[in-house]
């Protein structure tokens, strides 16, 4: 590849798929994880294997139901917190949704549900 950016994107996908393939997940879950990765990657959003593993567990009782669209919407905004040197925190209190992005790689490293901000988060 002559285009370093395209090469980096392809390498990220190959590395992510390889990491998924090494998991002891069911073949169905591996396929779903790769499909989610591709849907977000098509929008320029790259998810870690950890974040992908969290996706099916996001809708749980006691929390408002969310869809992939809600994650995309929160990421269109600005992070409202940071955690440590490397983490940008996108927190939607109404949706009780947290998306954590690595400041250096720009990858989504985790997605969790929480009702309130974490004490160690710093306001942006």
Regions found by a protein language model. Give the residues of each.
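Ribonuclease/tRNase effector modules and their secretory precursors
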Residues: 1-124
